[in-house]
Design a protein with these regions (language model features):
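Alpha-helical elements of Rossmann-like donor-binding domains used by nucleotide-donor carbohydrate transfer enzymes
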Residues: 26-27, 40, 67-68, 86, ...
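Short helix-capping segments at alpha-helix termini
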Residues: 33-34, 75-82, 109, 133-137, ...
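A metal-dependent, Asp-based hydrolase signature
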Residues: 35, 49-86
Length: 226
């Protein structure tokens, strides 16, 4: 059986796939909240975004992030606005995972185009790639702010393909840490790679990934060996 061709386009998720959210706990504590709140805050933000998208709304990441922090800080700190801004500044300055720079270099060395597609602002992704030293290797930093809906709505992935001039979804591969993102891309016709950074179990209710990798470097290695 012949192996599938190298994807013409690799679409990278940003939040948690490229960015390391682990420093957020300390940022929450420094802003007057609790360190353990960082992870449920981010999960709740995504939950509310998905619910609003399903209801027909199209909020921005910034709007939801700020308001959800104000709700969490209400009655607990003297200046909720300052607390929210302090946490958001930490979000905007998150570091990349250690494999990101080498992984993106390895992917582009294969001859495939690399872009990002985020539910967050394009500027945040651009700054993250700059800190990783690979901004010049990523063709475009796409955001659902310019798409009809948040990921995992299929329209967000098709928007990315259209922006990149890719007519056949099967010529693109999405790589993400979130099974819901992998599922959405798969249902939109893209090939997929689940970036399993934690040694987790992939949920059986999600459409399976074509590849399971541990890092972007591993992804490039797997594509090279196809």
């Amino acid at each position: 059986m012949s192996l599938p061709p190298l994807p013409a386009l690799v679409v990278l998720d940003v939040n948690e796939t490229l960015s390391d959210l682990s420093p957020l706990g300390a940022a929450f504590a420094a802003a007057g909240l609790q360190e353990h709140e960082a992870e449920p805050w981010f999960a709740g933000l995504l939950r509310d975004a998905f619910a609003l998208t399903a209801a027909g709304a199209h909020p921005t990441f910034g709007e939801l992030a700020r308001e959800s922090l104000l709700v969490r800080a209400h009655g607990r700190v003297a200046d909720p606005d300052a607390t929210a801004e302090q946490v958001l500044e930490a979000v905007r300055g998150l570091p990349p995972h250690p494999d990101v720079a080498d992984g993106i270099r390895a992917l582009t060395a294969l001859g495939t185009r690399v872009v990002t597609l985020s539910n967050g602002p394009a500027a945040t992704a651009e700054a993250l790639l700059g800190r990783a030293g690979v901004a010049d290797l990523v063709e475009r930093t796409l955001s659902v702010d310019d798409a009809p809906a948040w990921k995992p709505d299929r329209r967000s992935y098709l928007h990315a393909l259209d922006a990149c001039g890719v007519g056949d979804a099967g010529e693109a591969l999405l790589a993400a840490v979130h099974p819901w993102d992998v599922d959405g891309a798969r249902r939109a016709g893209l090939r997929t790679a689940w970036v399993d950074r934690r040694g987790s179990r992939y949920p059986a209710y999600a459409a399976p990934a074509d590849l399971t990798v541990t890092s972007l470097v591993d992804l490039a290695d797997r594509l090279r060996a196809r």
